[in-house]
């Protein structure tokens, strides 16, 4: 694989070689796009080569997907659930290999890589149960001998465009639900994590083949903006789920809206943790460490802003600075590493540029603030003391950079939390019930995820995941998110011989 490095030998266990076709369309592997190399962010050396999909591959795949949709939507929901159960079992059988690949190709530490694959397995389990609970309402009719009810039917095809930071979890949030709801899936993985796209798809394809189902039910393509743009423009895809930057997400939304399609957007986050004067300081400090340093600050739910009550400011900061100095930076596959590399050399450059902007706006670096010299994309975990009014605080720097802000009252803290354009995740540390219920109430956090005494990141799959404002407003994963993947029809049935009209209208 890319080198004689023993580190890569396990890839053959999940169907990968030194040269891979990056397009699974019409039930077969083919690819006629450009040849790219996927790189190990720990050293920027090639892991393997991938041939990306072309627009011709895309069109062939969508035609087959259209035909497969006619078959898949007629399979009973519990049977579709059984297929998703088998996909979960297939992932379980390769959990460690897939987790290792994710760590190798994306750069997150091994525990997080395995945890991400486990999240997809959990989504499969959730979807299996859901397949017997796609319930519609039965509604009393005001007219005699009439019945009203809701029917939920598949949309047909769901497009899923995922990002590098969670190259398979976000697929799981969408695809597991879309499949049990009777939709085919067209997946475009991130261009910098093609191997995880291929490895995941191979397992899904094996399950479909074993059950004599069309492979086109799950169509996957490695590629860049050209393929993503095709998905956004395609009227055959009624729903497009996009995870990525606000800039690209806005373009996707405009393109899909122009054809009257629907979008699920999971864009940027600028998440805050509030530590009140009555908080458990140790619990808060441990939570902030994971929230700010985990995945090298490349989660959409990473804690970017730490709001400390003036009475506990010094104490919390002292604990955090001690913890930060003990963070092991290094190869994400090595035991004990807590901070792996940023995903690309460009990410490392953006970190360095961001630090200069922060300094120019009055930011005081308390620890970190430097890129680590060497061949990988490593940077130091960074804590910065800064004013809440600094313009840079309103932006998302996708790196382990934590802004520390001081406040005097609960109301001031909530105002700072809500002062940014994004509205994904938030958390407060307090023992006071009044603070808790004000925080989760209508005048509290304006985010889609509102936590108490836990980090901003690490969401469970049972709840709906998503945010408000510039984050996009979509909801994926658990709860009743499934309704976004189906078409709702209100049906009124007359089983009598008369024709009474609603609202008592007499017409002729």
From Swiss-Prot:
Binding-site list for NAD(+): 244-249
Reactions catalysed: an aldehyde + NAD(+) + H2O = a carboxylate + NADH + 2 H(+)
GO-annotated biological processes: aldehyde metabolic process; response to abscisic acid; response to desiccation; response to salt stress
Entry annotated with the keyword NAD: yes
UniProt cross-references to Pfam families, sorted A to Z: Aldedh
GO MF assignments: aldehyde dehydrogenase (NAD+) activity
CDD domains: ALDH_F7_AASADH
Induction cue: By abscisic acid (ABA) and dehydration in roots and plantlets, and by salt stress in plantlets.
UniProt entry keywords in alphabetical sequence: NAD, Oxidoreductase, Stress response
Site (Transition state stabilizer) location in chain: 165
Regions annotated as coiled coil: none
Entry annotation: catalytic residues: 266 (proton acceptor), 300 (nucleophile)
Assembly description: Homotetramer.
Family: Belongs to the aldehyde dehydrogenase family.
UniProt protein name: Aldehyde dehydrogenase family 7 member B4
